[in-house]
UniProtKB/Swiss-Prot annotation:
Modified residues (O-AMP-tyrosine): 406
Name of the protein in question: Glutamine synthetase
NCBIfam families in UniProt: GlnA (TIGR00653)
Organism: Mycobacterium tuberculosis (strain ATCC 25618 / H37Rv)
GS catalytic domain boundaries: 108-478
Amino acid sequence: MTEKTPDDVFKLAKDEKVEYVDVRFCDLPGIMQHFTIPASAFDKSVFDDGLAFDGSSIRGFQSIHESDMLLLPDPETARIDPFRAAKTLNINFFVHDPFTLEPYSRDPRNIARKAENYLISTGIADTAYFGAEAEFYIFDSVSFDSRANGSFYEVDAISGWWNTGAATEADGSPNRGYKVRHKGGYFPVAPNDQYVDLRDKMLTNLINSGFILEKGHHEVGSGGQAEINYQFNSLLHAADDMQLYKYIIKNTAWQNGKTVTFMPKPLFGDNGSGMHCHQSLWKDGAPLMYDETGYAGLSDTARHYIGGLLHHAPSLLAFTNPTVNSYKRLVPGYEAPINLVYSQRNRSACVRIPITGSNPKAKRLEFRSPDSSGNPYLAFSAMLMAGLDGIKNKIEPQAPVDKDLYELPPEEAASIPQTPTQLSDVIDRLEADHEYLTEGGVFTNDLIETWISFKRENEIEPVNIRPHPYEFALYYDV
């Protein structure tokens, strides 16, 4: 990302004849919030004095009696919006206390910034790079409801295998076949891949917004699962990239009559959508993860970083897999990484070491468990803090496992730890194991307590008290 100053932003706004500035910040669960001001009101005072807003209406922020908050712009995030009818400049802001002007401790972007500063303070490294690969589904329609006397959801995509018997295509013409089999969507060309033109539009919008792309393709799942990969970035910017990526993917689909979801598991019986996170540490422009004598070319630093990720995974997943739906994905049989080990070839391991040859700059690890249902600022920061704890305390991971973990004999499989099976478990683990997150004041106890309460009250308990439709298939005639 090119460094920008306030003057650069003003010049961009003038050159592009910007009419409006969209003020953006992130709530605690991970949804970007915004309001719009006219370009004429966007001047130096915004950078000096900020913009006030009511924080009591933002999830996870202030209570009503202390609602006033302040926003200060981050000039490096200025981008022209590709979707607005009027020429609009989008800018991400940091949240501050309006009286002390201190960064707000529950602002996710501020937490990511603190994580980067803490990394530097340790002397271990000065830059953490993250490359996140977020999968998603493209549907034609979605409907759902949850009432006292009924509950349902239904998604549809004309390319879904369940539509082999449909009379017509989406345009009303006769069914012409070429539906994608469950778990059969990885790489077939058109007409099996019916989304190539839409993905091309997504690619174009991403490129025009500054992304350096690697590839886009249909993913394994039927019904339009897809993935588009782009270049890594430093932690805070990588989280900004993920939020912008999701905004562009969703709105490109919306403008073309489709709807996108990043839910980890929207379909029963097919692959879920993950957010594999490639990570590496650098210092003074030099990579720290490579040692030609180590397993898979890993340095001691890299191995201990992995040790920290795996050791803290049961609590770390509270930020990297933070929804009830996350644990519908982390089950055997769907290429999901549920085994808390590392490997240079096994994709069912939580940590995989990509084959990068002898290039030290390319050496990295891939944490495969995360999904994109949460807050990338918190997720990336939490992963870094777990890895740094591993380095500081020289946490050794369990020996690498290069066998097919699903084919191990029972006695050997029993020695392989696995990810927790439900959100309530990882929230309990976070309550017991979070000191690694509060090192250097990166995460505060208040933030962690707020996260735990929010998840229990707004997600875990509401799901637990509602009858599930499948329970009627099991128990109605008891």
